[in-house]
Amino acid sequence: MLVKKLAGKGGGRESGSEDPRPLGQRCAGTMPSCTALATLLSVVAVAFCFYLGVKTNDLQARIAALESAKGTPSFHPLSDTVDELKAMVQEKVERLLAQKSYEHMAKIRTAREAPLECNCPAGPPGKRGKRGRRGESGPPGQPGPQGPPGPKGDKGEQGDQGPRMVFPKINHGFLSADQQLIKRRLIKGDQGQAGPPGPPGPPGPRGPPGDTGKDGPRGMPGVPGEPGKPGEQGLMGPLGPPGQKGSIGAPGTPGMDGQKGEPGSPGAAGQSGLPGPKGEPGKEGEKGDAGENGPKGDTGEKGDPGSSAAGIKGEPGESGRPGQKGEPGLPGLPGLPGIKGEPGFIGPQGEPGLPGLPGTKGDRGEAGPPGRGERGDPGAPGPKGKQGESGARGPKGSKGDRGDKGDSGALGPRGPPGQKGDPGATEIIDYNGNLHEALQRITTLTVTGPPGPPGPQGLQGPKGEQGSPGIPGVDGEQGLKGSKGDMGDPGVPGEKGGLGLPGLPGANGVKGEKGDTGLPGPQGPSIIGPPGPPGPHGPPGPMGPHGLPGPKGASGLDGKPGSRGADGPIGPHGPAGPKGERGEKGAMGEPGPRGPYGLPGKDGEPGLDGFPGPRGEKGDLGEKGEKGFRGVKGEKGEPGQPGLDGLDAPCQLGPDGLPMPGCWQK
């Protein structure tokens, strides 16, 4: 079949025709494929066998590990020897013997270590409490979303009759909806009444510039202008002479915590300290509590009576197995705190380290609040300029957009370093571990420093709102630009300013170099504290192995007489005794119970009217009532009167919806 299938794949031969090649050549062509297939199957079988061997070995290792973890010895008859079998059987027999002997032993109940606190379960839930008082009214909530559209209104009244057509006999049905233009040209009604003025439209686009108007009349001379704005910042002047030595400045605000420095190199070995005084001998410890008595052993069996002759001395018995190690006891209570040592001597002050490298430039800070400078003196009036020619009046410009806020100018260069200040106060503040009190004492030092340098110039304030248009003045002649005035004399130095605001915390400086190692301080006196109290008793250890039966005990002494027995049952009643003498008269009895109510009395006469009582106090405010239902929609009102005619020019509306004031006067 294989030969036929291979032969049937030929292009020009039919499926039913046979291959004309001999049988040897045909089989030789299929041998390589069969060999490759057999080789592939062999490789797959070998790989599968290897995989099964690895998995079996892994499974065997896991079973052995599980048996060793659970403590159940595995039984391998091929590898175990006779000695191992004996040891295994002996161990099982001993285990069974110990289990049986433990079952027949007297049960000893250990003392229960119950805690003093109650560990009872939670009780049933209580009854629901009374309703609390009404709380205060909360703040008004946020405005809710817009409600759904209201119901459709009532049908309007019928409109007035429209104008008559010009051609009433013409049927306009032939006109389609797309020929509205023809309708408007053929059917033109009378002019309707003027409608109400519409709302002011949006401002129109900017118109083209108008023609140059005629020269106006010559105006009056203009009002002197306002003093000019301060000029740009001038060049930096030469450095002045160094100022006088300033007083001690106030302590600055604590700076930001610097970054944690790298661990320093180990210091040099200090000088050996003086030997401390010999400590006093410790106090004698308290005597420990007596241990609990061990469980009493079982009574041994009665021995056989011994012979009168002395018995043979037996061999000494084997020593018992050592008991298991008890669990470690709980840690003892912490010892009493030691006596506070005397403060050590203050070491000499180390030499100041070298100044650190300047720090990197920090990020740009946020803009400060705008400064408020004092108003300067009015400048001297300049010379009167010549009257210029009147210029043509330009068109009115549109209102420009508000400009963006400009960036603050850069700070000036850093000034030269000042002279070295006086050394700070060397007051030693012993805070005794209370850092807060130490900081309070630092802040209470009354040291006033010189006033801080003037702050940088504030940013330009925002542009104010547009003022109302003023009275149009007469255009004066444009004067010539005056020459630059001479520099004025320096002003009188002002009074001493107040204390400046504390500056912003500076950027983190570069880590300074390591200072020299200070001299070792003197060694403080060594004080040995008293020994701590003994720790609590540890928990009782586990019960030891069962002891061997003890020897026969001696005959006991006679017991003590027992306690008195319980009373016996009551005997039968005896015969009746003789009649007694007559008794004395008894005492008077207690009053009897209250009798029934009497009949109601007659109605009394009406009494006099009483005086009017005082006016009662004002009652509390009642609770807020529930929200009422929505009212019925009212009837439609009468149509309003026609409004006024619209304005010629659209005016800008204000926030209240009305035109801006003064718009009609333009």
Swiss-Prot record:
PANTHER family: COLLAGEN ALPHA-1(XXV) CHAIN (PTHR37456:SF3), SI:CH211-266K2.1 (PTHR37456). The record marks R112, E113 as: Cleavage. Pfam families: Collagen. Residues 181-188 are annotated as: Interaction with amyloid-beta peptide. The keyword ATP-binding does not apply. It is a single-pass type II membrane protein. It comes from the Eukaryota. This is Collagen alpha-1(XXV) chain. It is found in: Membrane. Residues 494-503 have a biased composition (Gly residues). Residues 140-151, 196-208, 528-543 have a biased composition (Pro residues). Forms homodimers and homotrimers. Binds to the fibrillized forms of amyloid-beta protein 40 (beta-APP40) and amyloid-betad protein 42 (beta-APP42). Found associated with beta-APP42 more frequently than with beta-APP40. Residues 1-24, 116-168, 189-428, 445-666 are annotated as: Disordered. GO terms for cellular component: collagen trimer; collagen-containing extracellular matrix; extracellular region; extracellular space; plasma membrane. Residues 11-21, 280-290, 361-377, 398-407, 615-638 have a biased composition (Basic and acidic residues). Residues 55-666 are extracellular. Residues 1-33 are cytoplasmic. Undergoes proteolytic cleavage by furin protease to yield the soluble collagen-like Alzheimer amyloid plaque component. Glycosylated. Keywords: Amyloid, Collagen, Glycoprotein, Heparin-binding, Hydroxylation, Membrane, Repeat, Signal-anchor, Transmembrane, Transmembrane helix. Expressed predominantly in neurons with low levels also detected in heart, testis and eye. InterPro entries: Collagen, Collagen_Structural_Proteins.
